[in-house]
Regions:
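Conserved alpha/beta-domain cores
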Residues: 70-282
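Acidic, glycine-rich flexible loop/linker segments
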Residues: 1-106, 110-130
Length: 282
């Protein structure tokens, strides 16, 4: 993706993995075309434009274009905060130079997928893991660490720490993991610890996992990583966000569990947000 002049996909939407990563890389991308791979040929010269409204356009051949530069200093400052949505720590220092108020959303899923690759419970309950191939791969990944859990907390804290350091002292709001059960199952060793759901989109995800005995040990690793970032690294600009919280009672349970794991709301100005994404939140 870094080498491509532009990216065109048959499937996906604005929130798909390809679209999100393309935006972070500053790459021109059109997703969800349906049949681009059938209509375009290898070696064909085309021009891809994402500057003409909500729909991207693909033109035959190489077209010329004009570049218009805008002096941001003449525009003044907005009354509201303008913050970025970022996931890739490697892009943090590039975007930290932008005139923004911080990061409004950093998703942990990308860091877990790319830097860790293993299911949290496959690490904390490694001795229970039945998949021999997954065990071998996890052994290889964690060979340089004192234990399986520190592999998770060190890698996750480094990813978040890189983002927070780049933007310090501006806020970086980190959303705790929001994998759906089918996505958790795709992590190394994950299938053993995840139920098969008919509709994972509204299933065992978000806040409901954090205090549940079936995943509580995994959430403990996430909390420890965030504690390391805030306390050991001193990056207290990190705020935390809880996704898919269905009820007030559920939110209170999560707050209690986070305090149990060293993240007390209000301590050292720790702020804990809820992501407003389902009707009951409103």
């Amino acid at each position: 993706m870094k080498r491509a002049s532009a990216i065109i996909t048959n499937g996906g939407g604005r929130t798909s993995h390809a679209a999100i990563v393309a935006r972070e890389l500053g790459a021109v991308a059109i997703v969800g075309t349906g049949d681009a791979t059938e209509k375009l040929e290898d070696g064909q010269e085309i021009t891809v434009s994402c500057a003409e409204g909500n729909e991207g356009k693909v033109y035959e051949g190489k077209l010329e274009w004009d570049t218009e530069e805008i002096d941001l200093e003449e525009m003044g400052d907005p009354d509201t905060q303008v913050m970025l949505i970022l996931a890739n720590p490697k892009m943090a220092y590039k975007y930290a130079s932008y005139p923004v108020d911080g990061v409004g959303l950093m998703r942990l899923e990308f860091a877990i997928n790319n830097a860790i690759k293993a299911h949290p419970l496959a690490l904390s309950r490694f001795d229970e893991l039945e998949d021999e191939e997954a065990k071998r791969k996890i052994e290889d990944l964690t060979a340089a660490y004192p234990d399986k859990e520190s592999y998770f907390t060190e890698n996750l804290s480094q990813a978040v720490g890189a983002m927070a350091a780049a933007f310090y002292p501006r806020e970086v709001i980190v959303r705790m993991s929001d994998f759906k059960t089918n996505e958790y199952a795709d992590l190394l060793g994950g299938k053993q610890f995840e139920p098969k759901e008919e509709n994972p989109m509204v299933g065992f995800r978000g806040a409901s996992r954090y205090y549940n005995e079936r995943y509580k040990d995994g959430f403990k690793l996430e909390c420890e990583a965030m504690r390391i970032v805030r306390e050991d690294m001193g990056l207290d600009n990190v705020k935390l966000m809880i996704p898919f919280c269905r009820t007030v009672d559920e939110g209170k349970k999560v707050i209690e569990v986070m305090e149990e794991y060293g993240l007390k709301q209000g301590k050292d100005n720790l702020e804990i947000y809820v992501m407003c994404e389902i009707p009951s939140n409103v």
